[in-house]
Amino acid sequence: MTTPPSLPRHARVVIVGGGVIGTSTAYHLALMGWQDIVLLERHQLTAGTTWHAAGLMVTYGSTSETSTEIRKYTRDLYGRLEAETGQATGFMPIGFIEVASDKDRLEEFRRVAAFNRYCGIDVQEISPRQVQELFPLAKVDDIEAGFYVKEDGRVNPVDVTMALGKGARMRGVKILEGVPATGVLQKSGRVTGVRTPYGDIQTDFVVNCAGLWARELGAMSGVAISNQAAEHYYLITEAIKDLPPNMPVLEDPSAYGYYRQEGGGLMVGLFEPVCAPWKIDGTPTDTPYLDLEPDWERMGPYLETAMSRVPVTSQVGMKKFFCGPESFTPDLKPIVGEAPELRGYFVAAGLNSIGILTGGGLGRVMAHWIINGLPDVDVTGMNIDRVLPFQANPEYRRSRTVESLGMVYKCH
């Protein structure tokens, strides 16, 4: 193969993966002053899971100080990126409401709200009547309360990624699309380069942001990464007559659903309690923008339950019932940091469907870690050093993934 003129022979850092995490890491490395950064993307930016993300930008919900800070930073970053880069992010601070539909959820959400307030998130507990005033289409006669964050909302995931990519390019990052990483070179337990079909790039640091493909890329270098793809669903309705403008995002874990406006109708997103792992034996690398055949029989009861919270969704036509692969980990925490098996090999993957709402902050954390040798926040709970080799075996991934997606909406 002829080496493209644009393929450098050396880079200070090579990032593999052009989704929101990869572009954010590139952006923050450049923002902190590092030059000679290269990002490799096998297909096109966003072609893995970022393109089909729902785009929720929510700071409420975590009881981790680190995770809450990362979410808050991400929301603030998305709010200012357009002014910096000229590329829209689609950020709309329309608000977010978490619905407590029983006493147990009420107790849990009050505890979460108190912790989030401590972390600087303005969370208000509101009555069922106030929930309906903000989201008139919701059925509220069986709920206890709502928890409202006015500054939260939604973004366009593709636009966010393009804005981060543009911001990175403006600071000198070289983004190469259509260039896969086929291996990582090493010597004496340390990264020395990245192999591509067009030649090798010498480097001291590799960042695996390959999303769905992170496990396979890690395995090439003996790095254990225990993420696994699973089916993930949302429905988009036909246009709804007299749909109130700028309703907040609504979420009801007891109904397995979240709801936001989409193209004149509503999106109904799902986190079912028992999910379906996808491609246990390996994720296909030759197909970008994966759009899977929905399992109507399995998902029908969950969809029915979710639609009951917003009854109009079952009274209008259905534009699309989308199923796409999303990456989950056994403990529902991201896998980030320097791999214990190989010095200079960093990982940021396994985002468990929160890649958009943590992407900005996680890219910052990775940049600090690479540049300074330490992250700028406590990442103990998500550090890759907790991953054991057996957790990457197929049966373990299958059995744990069946449960892990359902943990998102489980009452804790």
Regions found by a protein language model. Give the residues of each.
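Short beta-strand to alpha-helix junction loop
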Residues: E69, V99-E107, F147-K166, L176, ...
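Dinucleotide-binding Rossmann-like beta1-alpha1 core, especially the glycine-rich loop
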Residues: G55-L134, S254-Y259, G263-G265, L290
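Glycine-rich FAD pyrophosphate-binding loop
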Residues: A30-W51
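Helical element adjacent to the flavin cofactor pocket in flavoenzyme catalytic cores
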Residues: Y148-F205
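Beta1/beta-strand and adjacent pyrophosphate-binding region of the FAD-binding site
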Residues: L7-I21, V38
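Active-site lid/adjacent beta-loop-alpha segment flanking the redox-cofactor pocket in flavoenzymes
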Residues: V223-A224, A239-G344
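C-terminal catalytic lobe of FAD-dependent flavoproteins
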Residues: P157, E293-C411
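Central helical "cap/lid" subdomain
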Residues: G199-N246, V377
